[in-house]
């Protein structure tokens, strides 16, 4: 056992609970485990000794209540509460024990303990009810005491004990019964005579001084809270409190101390006595403290409490006898007024009452004068004084002056001293420059003017004017001057107001006060006192709001002549439309200034002002250019309202259309008055308005469409209830527009027809030629119609036609996404589809419209709405038609059963129209389309059919349809556009071919069935696919046929051989570079066709080109490199020095794009380039050929790799780099080849191609990386290391791990470190080669180490150098490098001589030994080394002896 465990065990054994358990097991009792054994429990031993025995669990809990740690006491109280709630039989005995601890717990140093104690008491009283009465004497006094606890939570819990523990009628009785004990307890604690004043020896929560202060405060609060609650109803508190005040030693000690809170509490208690003055005066220290605290500067309550006491004492003669009013209180009062400090916060409330009492007792006329003049003594204020105190000083002065002037009994001689005092206080208010101080003094002046109490007001206002102009600086006097002139009605202030306005730099508020003057007499008097009006002429300094006030002033005095500018004042004057101002100031203003004003309002989008100004100027004969404001709603509304009813209706309609466009195009929400103004002008015909609006909408956001719909609803909602439906019907989509728009979308119905599993409906439109739009044009159209559909269905005034249109557009958007499936659907179209799906509903009315043939493009609706199958009626009726239609709509349990039934019908006398293509007979097309759709559903189950004739018939049907379609399409390249149903049928049969091919690869079908499919049907269908490919054009759109052909071509693994040279080569493009290789005519035409399609702007067409070029690449490579692929390794001597080199197929280089318009073509061609390296067996590659081919493609590879980087699924411009590869999908992107068309096709293709390049050409990738600009290298390394290198290292290690080596060669891998360790035992000696792959492989070179070489060191180093060169420069694979190293070791041990040119045994490229022997010197050479010697020296002699080899 560890020391720590022993300590834990000892601690457990030391606990009282564990000890009791051990003793009980041994037969001992609890006797002997007394509190004396714990030094912290002695205090409770006496209490616990006298009560009845309690159970062990309760005793443990009780022990916790006396522990020194407050957390233990808290835990004990919580456990006790749980015991009380468990209905324990020992609750009563627990209660008796607890009562003995209440005194300690209710005064505990921890607030939590005190609060929990109150809750425990409350639980005991609730549980025990009457049984708890015997302990109330010990509990209730402390509960009442706790109601005054300094912690609010404890006080609230104590109040809850009384509230919840007793009935309502007994609460008062309980309080009165036990409160005397509480008062005695409180008095003793306050005097320090109670044992609870000292901290309990078990309580470590607070120190002595803190506990004493808390309990003393709580004790005095006990008296005050009782007095506050019961007031004069009870005097139970007086006797204990009087004893407290009779203890002169205690009172002196308290007031001599520094505990101001206790002093304030004692003062408040003394004020509550019925003979309070006698109690106060009996303790001189109290009255002394009161007088001394009248100017206390603290923010506590002692100052206010002292003033309460002085107001109690002042009227009483007994106080006068002990303290002279004339010599003591009066001088003290003057000092308090003269002193400028924080005590003014209190003095504000008590000065007037005190002075009033003092005046009654002292008949001294000079008293008031002394007091009022003392206000301005001892200035300036103390720096530490608060602004609140200063504001109180101002308010007190104002109230004092009003009190003096409003009291007739006071000598009016003081009036002569008031004027300078008020002026001085005005100076002080300007000095402090606060709103509160200014309002106090200016309000006093206004009051004095109203009361007319000044004998010489002119002199007073002269002093005031001098003070404003000369004493205070301008920035300080502005607020006071504004406040003084604000009412603008007292004529006494008009002279002052006029003088203030005569200053050119006068504050705007002074001007505003005059403009707002309601008293015309005051306005005229003020204007007479204005010396000049420069303050208005300098109009540039006023802002827009100020300009309104200035114009008011000018309108009140239109005689003023002003210079008008394009500023706020000038524009406001123009909008006033005042003829007097026009004649005086505006008439001669140049028109250019007015145009500038209009342009300004246009920038601020204030159309209302533009219209108002333009109309006014038009009346005055001035025309302005308003084109800039043509889209402003307020401007247009104002113009519309100003139109005369007799004017041209067409002009009115155009204006309404402009207004509608502006209203719905506005970014901000139009105002309600805009809708109100427009509602009366909606009587015209605006049916195509929203169609044009959405066609020209620049914002690509479905939310914007919803905003427009909400505005439309709001607009129509302002119209009369009876006309709303009619107006809405005129403006939004109608039946005719719905049909027209459905007609536009027919080119996408073909996409629905070929994928939908619902009933096919053959409409007249599908029998007519279809013009397929380009991607941008198609997307733009679908967006416009989608917006219109969302608007219509989102409006509250939508109908079933709008719902039908919305259902249709949901499928149209999906069809567009399917057509251009290599890209993600446009974000706005996604939003439109989501919003439409939220709002469409199904109803009987919509169902009826569909059944009645309301929809022109029903296949859209049937695919989304899911209507019940309804048999189509055909015009071409014959007697056997019913039977045929019955077969078409036949219900079967399985698709295979349906196909079989149709087969039987086709063999009957009625000759069911299968594989017949009469364009005029719709039912034949319906039969064929329905059949092939069910056949696709059937899938590989056809191979399980027991009826061989049925199976052969259906499979031969595929060949029949494709043969017919191919012949028709070759004869007429545009036949699919002219006959959409033929395209649909061909598409479905190509899909069927793909489905059946996949089924044979995955399904468990008989070998005979699969073999028959692969050997007979598949080659023929492959031939038709290639022939169909020959009809593809560069400008062709990705229609269902194009997409299906692409899927079918990706299924083909090699180019078909069953073609004659004359097949489909009539229109072959002649390419001189190809003609030199003498390709078969058909192959040459396919090559030319495939590589020409790479120039298409359509990605599906590019992929079709890639899919066919992928099949042709092995043929091209072998034919164009036929001479170079012939191996010369078996000949003894390479006599000829003109050996042919490998080359890249000519069409790959020729087809590489010269610009970046088609970014995917480069990577597609790069993948074709790597095919010979991927399939070395099919290409006839030797190691020498491989190295040579890598050298040949190097320039092309670097160029194509740059294009490949652009296609990678990374956002290199983001910080950090963004990745489009989903989490945990790295393997699917880098290791799996996925040729299914989807929006992530090129992301996956580029990722896989990069990984393939890293695998096949690691050295080329490394050199590409090293040649990158420095700014791109970290980004490339980060992405490769994070996503690809890990998988590549894992793949390389896997190849080595699965490889089998001959002899004593053992190879193991260490995946954690990326190491490969090759151990080779030769002649009982073990050699160890370690290859370490770095984390960013192949960007960094693997590390190579060799231990215990059995040959000379220089030779072992040569092997390592050769291996390093192979891996670093020649794109060698790790596994091949290990095998090369092993051959070097083997031949070195066998004694094989080195080639005397390269000085190596095994050739680095061909992995062959030196075989070519010189007849003269007998030295042997590698054939490749000798060939390079011949080529570089331009002669055929031995490099050593110079003997001629030829």
Swiss-Prot record:
> Where are the RING-type Zn fingers located?
1395-1442
UniProt feature coiled coil, ranges? none
Q: Which domain of life is it from?
A: Eukaryota
What is the predominant subcellular site recorded for this chain?
cytoplasm
Q: Which InterPro entries match?
A: ARM-like, ARM-type_fold, LTN1/Rkr1, LTN1_HEAT_5th, LTN1_UBC, RING-CH-C4HC3_LTN1, Znf_RING, Znf_RING/FYVE/PHD
Q: Which GO terms describe its biological process?
A: protein ubiquitination; rescue of stalled ribosome; ribosome-associated ubiquitin-dependent protein catabolic process
Its pathway is: Protein modification; protein ubiquitination
Subcellular location per UniProt equals: Cytoplasm, Cytosol
Is Zinc-finger a UniProt keyword of this protein?
yes
* Record carries keyword Cytoplasm: yes
Q: Which GO terms describe its molecular function?
A: ribosomal large subunit binding; ubiquitin protein ligase activity; zinc ion binding
Gene Ontology annotations for the cellular component aspect, listed alphabetically: cytosol; RQC complex
One Pfam family in the UniProt entry: UBC_like
Keywords on record: Cytoplasm, Metal-binding, Repeat, Transferase, Ubl conjugation pathway, Zinc, Zinc-finger
- Disulfide pairs here are none
What residue spans do the HEAT repeats cover? 71-108, 115-153, 324-361, 363-399, 413-450, 630-669, 684-721, 1046-1083, 1107-1144, 1165-1202, 1251-1289
What EC number(s) does this enzyme carry? 2.3.2.27
Q: How does it assemble?
A: Component of the ribosome quality control complex (RQC), composed of at least the E3 ubiquitin ligase ltn1 and nemf. The complex probably also contains tcf25 as well as vcp/p97 and its ubiquitin-binding cofactors. RQC forms a stable complex with 60S ribosomal subunits.
Q: What does this protein do?
A: E3 ubiquitin-protein ligase. Component of the ribosome quality control complex (RQC), a ribosome-associated complex that mediates ubiquitination and extraction of incompletely synthesized nascent chains for proteasomal degradation. Ubiquitination leads to vcp/p97 recruitment for extraction and degradation of the incomplete translation product.
Give the record's family classification: Belongs to the LTN1 family.
The entry's protein name is E3 ubiquitin-protein ligase listerin
Q: Which organism is it from?
A: Caenorhabditis elegans
